[in-house]
Amino acid sequence: MFGRAVGRLLRDRTGNVLMMAAASMPLLVGAAGLATDTVQWTLWKRQIQRQADSAALAGAYAVAQGFNASDSATADISRMALVALTQTPTIENAPTSGPFAGNAQAVRVVLQTSAELPFSKILGVKAPVIYGEATAAVVGSGDYCVVSLEKTSTVGITLQGNATVNLGCGIVTNSRASNAVYAGGSSTVAATPVAAVGGLTSSSNYATGTTLLPYSIPVQDPFAGLPTPTAANFTGCNQKLSAKSGETQSYSPGCYNNVDIKGTVNLEKGVYYIDATSFDVGAQATINGTDVTIILTSSNAANNPSSISTININGGATINLKAPTDTANPYHGVLFYQDRRALDSGTNTINGNASSVLQGAFYFPGQAMSFSGTSGMTTDCVKMVGKRVTFIGNSNIVNQCKDTGVDKFTATLVKLVG
């Protein structure tokens, strides 16, 4: 009887699954554990890559602003500290490898981590070395012909009323306003890119295809190197530059402290210093000049910056003025230049009629400027740099500046490039 019981037990198969499950349980637990460790390694990979991206961008932003790339990248790595690093970070400016190798405007960061995890250690799986590598660079964001140097939260560039602005280039402002460029009313704006240190709001006033670049890095003053007027420039500054209605007058370069143009004025080649007065051009006046630069300043600018000259060119005036083209001239490409010591208390107005021809840069670093073009006005090469810039009326600026002495304004942005 005992023998029959043993035989039945040997023939019984109902416990096989349980036995097989018990035998395979270590493998199942190990596989699940290894999967858990793999998820952790994947998370670390994402975190270390994010840390490398952030550090490279911090380094590139430092380069853009003239600071030390390595210091900024190192500080950013310490700040984020998403992953415990097992090797000293590699920070290169310029990179030694990749498409930006040797580029001093680029920063490459390589980070490394490695750590054993419980399940993989039990299974004898060696912990992988996880890398994060990123390269960020300061690159050009486009060519600009309108630059606003405003640094506060005030709107930098305004396009209003029925202004039709076709610039054939970009516009950029250092304004930190939430909408740093205002395109309102029935204005139509064809300018790309549109960049700002602050925010930018999409608008139907922008032409189709316009690229908006909010939160860009500040643009440098493209004319920061122009010399500031000195006492020597004001020698014999007791002259009047004027023409009555219906008469024609010609003038030589020099210093003038009284300007009132109602007739026709011809300016000879050279630099004209306008001392502590308003450069007024009447509605029916005509002013002609080639290779000229008009500097709005004051002989007492150091003690009384509010005395610095301004400009007011009325609509209807015929303005035929071209800046110097000789690159040996320190003012090459500059048509109007207001002393940068001017207080932010005035607006400079430049208008013109359909017969006007303007070529050169308008530079008003300390004050606002307003430009109102007219249909048919020739402005093939005009650049504008002001603390704030306002467009009213029609402005069709093609900006074909070859051989004119007017340099391009190229702004930059920081982005990941590898």
Features from the language model and the residues they span:
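Alpha-helical assembly-interface signal, strongest on the long, hydrophobic N-terminal helix that forms
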Residues: 1-75, 173, 177, 274
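Beta-strand-rich extracellular passenger or scaffold domains
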Residues: 153-160, 173, 179-183, 253-258, ...
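Short amphipathic secondary-structure patches
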Residues: 39-46, 50, 54-117, 136, ...
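Short, low-complexity, Pro/Ser/Thr/Gly-rich segments in the mature regions of secreted, periplasmic
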Residues: 232-243, 402-418
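Small-residue (G/S/T/A) turn/hinge positions that recur once per unit in extracellular repeat modules
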Residues: 161-165, 185-189, 200-212, 243-247, ...
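Acidic/polar low-complexity surface segments
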Residues: 214-237, 284, 291-299, 312-341, ...
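Short, ordered "entry" segments at domain starts
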Residues: 117-231, 343-385, 389-394
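Extended compositionally biased segments used for macromolecular assembly or nucleic-acid engagement
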Residues: 16-18, 26, 30-33, 38-42, ...
